Structures are given as C-alpha cells and as structure tokens.
Amino acid sequence: MSSPFQQILTTTSATNAIAASSAVPVECLHARGANSLASNAHTVLPGLDSQASPQSGQKEEMRRKNAEAQMQNDSNHSETTLFQSDLDTALQSLGYGSQTNQAYQNHPSRSREDITNSRAERHSQTSTQPKNVHAVSEPMATTSLDCGVLPLPSSALDEEFLNLDFPNQERIYIDLEPQHSNSTSSSSDEKCHCLSHIIQSLNRNRQGNHIRRDSMNKIHLLNEAAEQFLMCDSNHSKLWYIILLALYQDADDSLSSAEEPQERMGAHSGAKGFCGNIKSNLDTMVCHASLAWILNG
C-alpha cells in the first residue's frame, strides 16, 4: 500500500500531465483564432470598401452636379444682368419705353429687389424729363379752330356797323355813312343824297304789306337808287356795294319764289316778258355794282 506522500506526488504529476496535454490545444486554438481573424478581416474589409465606394461615388457625383448647376445659375444671372443693362441703355438712348421691356421687368424669374430698383430708376428718369417734350413722330394736326391765334377785327368794321332801327331817316343816314368818308360835311345842303335815297326806298317798300311784298317794285326802287349811287362822285364806303349786292340778291330770290296772282301780273304772256326784263336789268346793275366796287377798291 502506498504512502500518502506517494499519492500526492502521483496526483501532482497527473495534474501536470493533464495541464501539459491541454496546453497544446489552447495555444493551437489561439494561433488558429488569430490567423482566422486576420484572414477574415482581410476578407471583410475589401467587401466593405466595395460597398462604400458606390455610395461615395454617388455623393461625389451629386456634389459635382450641384456645383455645376450653381455655376450655371451664376452665369445665367450675370448674362441676365448684362442683358438688362444693355436693354436699359438702348431704351434710354431711344427715349421711349416698350412693352417688351415692361414684360421683362415683371417677369417672375427676376427677384423682387431687382424689380423694385428698376421701377424706382424708371420713375426718377421720367420725373426728370420736361413736361412739354413731345415725340418727333407725334401728329400735330388739330380738328378744331383755335380762336386764340386769329387776328383782331379791324376798327373800320365798328365804324361801318349797320343798324336800321333808328327813329328818323336823317339819323339813319348819318350813322350809316362812315366818319372818314368825304361825303360828310358841315353843311347839310352839300351832303350826298344817294344813300338817303336808298334808305327811303327801302323804308317805303317796308311800309307796305309785310305778308306779300311787291318784289318787282323793290327791284325798280333798287335800280333807281343804284343808278344814283353809281353816278355819285363821293367816296362811299365799300360796305355799301356789298349792301346793294345783298339787296339785289334778296329781291331776285323773292321774285323767283313768289307766285303773284294773275290779276296783279296782267296778262300771262306780258308778265313773262316783263319779269324777263326786270331780271335782265337786275343782272346789269349787279355787274355795275361789282365793277364799281372793284374800281374803288
């Protein structure tokens, strides 16, 4: 039977043997684990790199595209600014605005600050221009008569103004004859009576029947007054020739339009011949009055 000391030695040696036998697998395990981890790391890292490289490439591509778009926007903005500057310069040299420029000013692509600044600049340029400046192509035609540019009437018209509603014939004669006429004198015996004869003839014809006046009698009176008037040596006013022509024209119109009764005209054939003679005398006296007016003018 072995002693206790021998049993202890046997147990110790057995333990050492077990430990020695178990140390080799542990070391081998550690070596194999380290090698496998390294190999696995080398295997995994390329896979991660291959997975990360497309994502980084996409990000880089997006970053590059964004930079190009920003550069393009900057270039477009600079070109727009240059175009607007050239357009404003051209419009200022021409001196007028255009609808194209107005549409461009209000385009939504332009910023609100640029639109406000351009409007303020146009307002200042418009306010500095004078009010009375007109375009060269503006028509100057007018459709109404401007009375401000008409000359003033002559004072001779006021002196020769006619007013037949006077109480007596002498006042009519004095006021109808112009003051600068040579026919007016201090002595009433030396005054010309041809004008008063015309007034008397007209007054006698006016005192007749106002409803139906005798046109032929009026023409006879005008013939007598005109003959005396044309033979007068006084320097009468030109207005009297106009009065005579107007009186003859009025008598001619009355003679042409009036229908006289047959008993007042006499026989029908005789009336036609008599009216023809009156019209002939009328035309002759009108010619004489016109000629005298021209010669004395």
Curated annotation (Swiss-Prot):
Region of interest (Disordered), ranges: 45-80, 100-134
Compositional bias (Polar residues): 69-80
Biased composition (Basic and acidic residues): 58-67, 110-124
Subcellular location: Nucleus
Keywords: Nucleus, Transcription, Transcription regulation, Virulence
Principal place of residence: nucleus
One GO CC term, this protein: nucleus
Protein's name in the database: Probable transcription factor vicR
Annotated organism of origin: Bipolaris victoriae (strain FI3)
Gene: vicR
